[in-house]
Amino acid sequence: MNKIYYFILFCFAAFCFTACSDDDPEFSGIEGKDHYISDFALNVGGITYQATIAGDKITVEIPYNTDLEGATAAYTLSEGATINPNPSTIQDWENEWKFVVTSKMQESKVYSYTYRYADIEQSGSVVLATQADVDNFAETGINRIDGNLTIGTADGEEITNLEGLANLKQISNTLILNPSYKGADLSGLDNLEQLGSFKLGSIVSTSKNTTLKTVNLPSLLGVVGDFVINSSVIEKVSIPKVTTIGEDLYVASDALLDLDANAVESIGSSLIVKGSVIQKGSATTEAIVFSALKRVGSELAIQYFPKLQGIYLPALESVAGTASFTDMALIGSIAMTELYSAGGLTIKNCKEISTIELPGLTSCGEFSVDANKVNKFNISALRDAFGNMTLSNLLIEELDLSRINFNGNTLTLQCNRLNKIVGSETFNGNLLLLPKSCRLTEFTLEGILNMQGNFECEDYSLVKRFIMPFVNVAGDITIALNSGSVDTGV
């Protein structure tokens, strides 16, 4: 009896399942769940450009100068899926689109469409000697040059605009501008992103181009080699997105008004900015700013700016060579608060400078400051002097040297108001006190017991009391006082 009961129950359940299945769509395997685009392409003028589909991104790569007007789409969906909007209804393929693909089971996936230009590379150097050459370059669609690009000649046909270079994004070697280019700026190179190097003139010779006033490369991101401008007429240099320059950044111009390189963080070799091409201050620049610069691989020099009032290097940490600031009549202060290492430092012919702030400097090579209005001088973190140090004409009255190791080098002090020096117990170097026309009546050396080098002091003609508590002087000692007494333990 039980067997008959279970048999009847089984048949009833099977009947119900069959009845329910008749009411639902029939799916085989995963057929009803798929919601993807398996193939996508655009056809432009009879040419098909196959898309790359990566995840939910559809990207069509087309050559430069390709017009997508009139383009049509071909695509393949998973079986049973639908797409919205329908690509066959779209005419404007220069815009980005989003497509929703929906499966039979109403599961959806969103795809994003975009396009990009394919690189067309020219192997070898390119010379564009005439305006026609520049104009015709646009028709090639080339956006990368694996070599030099030379624009113009020494004295040939004039080139007045660079619009034919609008597609250009990369020059692996040097961009050279010759005098026959007569444009006032570099409009046409607005999309250039990478350069091997840039040459307008050279470090040793001035460009003969007299019409170019502005070097503007708004999209440039990096320079592998040198960026050199040596011109008597350049007024503005604008490379606002460049972050690295592999070798030299050299800018010299009699007419320089503005330099925008505020994204530059690293310069592999030297940074040289001059307000003159003939070592005579001419440019009327009032401020020089490198707000992101951290490292200079060799020399740093800013010089020949008679109107310059501010130098701003707030992020600068290291200069492998000498940092020199010279021939700037109006500069009032130099502050490099993050600088911790310099191969050397020179400040001279800056007659209005009163403040020198180097609070983080811990090591320096040859160090020379000659400035007769400096009354604030901060080198409080200095620990190692790896070259001679000379301070001339500063208005400081006290100087603390107690934490500095001079490593056998010479400290020369020619400061008429300096009346007190504090040193460590052992002074590891030579100390020369050589003021000019000094009118001090008292001078004190405090803390120094052992002088490991030479000691010399001269021209303290009015000093009545000269205190130096030396116990030992390893080298020569010279003391020339016209009057007064010397209190020493030597």
Regions found by a protein language model. Give the residues of each.
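Disulfide-braced loops of extracellular cysteine-rich modules
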Residues: 134-139, 161-163, 186, 259, ...
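Bacterial N-terminal signal peptides that target proteins for export
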Residues: 1-8
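C-terminal motif of bacterial Sec signal peptides marking the signal peptidase cleavage site
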Residues: 16-19
